[in-house]
Amino acid sequence: MRLISKRRIRFIVFILFGVLTVFVVSRLVVHFQYNQEIKFYKKYFQQRKDGLHEIYNPLEIKQIPKETIDDLYTARLDKELKNGEVIEWSKFAYVNYVTNADYLCNTLIIFNDLKQEFETKAKLVLLISKDLLDPNTSSNVAYISSLLNKIQAIDEDQVVIKLIDNIVKPKDTTPWNESLTKLLVFNQTEFDRVIYLDNDAILRSSLDELFFLPNYIKFAAPLTYWFLSNSDLEKSYHETRHREKQPINLQSYTKVLTKRIGKGQMIYNHLPSLPHSLYLNSNNIAQDIISSTSSLSPLFDFQSSKKVGKLKFASNLMVINPSKEAFDEIVNVMLPKILNKKEKYDMDLINEEMYNLKKIIYKQFIFFRKVRKLFKPEVLVLPFARYGLLTGSLRNPRHYSIIYNDVLGYKTLDNDGNDIPVGLNDSVAYSKYIHFSDYPLAKPWNYPSMKEFECIVKEEDAEDSKLEHQACDLWNSVYASYIQSREICLV
């Protein structure tokens, strides 16, 4: 057997070293170029945002405060009232999906509240598994049919019931093996915009205002705030105030936004930004942009921290502009990647394939560099205390400081820069959608009565008895309201 000569080995090593050198040098050049451009555009948008029209900042992911959402809705209603610009409510829909009969009562409760109590004019769309109405696969078809009749009777025209095929993960025996069926919401293309809701939740007010987010936004949702610590919050405040040199008082943003909405001006660049420290791997945006795409980045990403961003989009409430193109990509490209992976479900696909926060920055910046005036952002972050609160947070004191200020990196301060005291009851009073999540506690319909799972303070273990009693009372009131609502499902 002929051995490779030393000369040939040296030649191969030389070639490999040359390739490596070219790669590293080119990466450093790109890194330097990106850094220079990013510095320029950060300064550009800070100094010129007041006068910009149809030019959007690609270097940020924006959060929209609840006050601004309400201002947009009020402005749209005023156009209808004063200018006769009629809202086509048939182009909007609330959407639920049901693959488990135990959840169907919840849809009846939510749809009935939306129509009868909150008086929405939007369509109410239920995507329900065909299997639930098949006697060969379902043991309670009669009960399911009676609930469906009640749902349809809410309004014969406004309620739309669609029979669907489940998207099932093969060889997955977990309770979430059909959760990918949720992705069918992206295919409801007869509507311009839909509000998707998980129905294991309590709805406390209309969400109609979410239909009137800026038209260019294709996806908006709250974030998984429960992964954050108080240390993360403090870092985000420090980043906003010191590194970005922006005010952290949320009112300084909402006041400007209110005026701009009143004048019909662009608002995107004036929205508070999501602090980079919460979702990027380093303090250097250029570094993260490069590492977002380079297949060799694990080998050559010397400067990047290995810290993984804690924040993701929650998928229990989503505002979506459905499109055939997006759904085709989900079916043909994204689903095959995840179907056979263990412990990967709807939220994983949405955050890893569709709306990965880190990759969003990369895609925005690259597109902006190519055709600046054609770039439009597609995502917004919704305030989670109003649209994505978990019941578990009501009993978790570590979450209180987070839900008091649900635009991350910012606080509601008075004119002297002091925190405006916000109590737990006040914070929850603004919550419109509260998701049942108290693991290891089961969902409330699995218990014969409230007594089986009600919150009771153990005085001997209480660190702050008054606060814990307040939290328990609040938690119990949420569940008691739901238990009472279930009476509508009796047949």
UniProtKB/Swiss-Prot annotation:
N-acetylglucosaminyltransferase involved in the Golgi-specific modification of N-linked glycans. It comes from Saccharomyces cerevisiae (strain ATCC 204508 / S288c). N-glycosylated. Residues 1-10 are cytoplasmic. This is Glucose N-acetyltransferase 1. SUPFAM superfamilies: Nucleotide-diphospho-sugar transferases. Residues 32-491 are lumenal. It is found in: Golgi apparatus membrane; Vacuole membrane. Belongs to the GNT1 family. GO terms for biological process: protein N-linked glycosylation. CDD domains: GT8_GNT1. Keywords: Glycoprotein, Golgi apparatus, Membrane, Signal-anchor, Transferase, Transmembrane, Transmembrane helix, Vacuole. InterPro entries: GNT1/Glycosyltrans_8, Nucleotide-diphossugar_trans. Glycans are attached at N136, N177, N187, N425. The gene is GNT1. Gene3D superfamilies: Spore Coat Polysaccharide Biosynthesis Protein SpsA, Chain A (3.90.550.10). Its EC number is 2.4.1.-. GO terms for molecular function: acetylglucosaminyltransferase activity; glycosyltransferase activity. A motif (DXD) lies at residues 198-200. The chain crosses the membrane at residues 11-31. GO terms for cellular component: Golgi medial cisterna; Golgi membrane; vacuolar membrane. Present with 238 molecules/cell in log phase SD medium. It is a single-pass type II membrane protein.
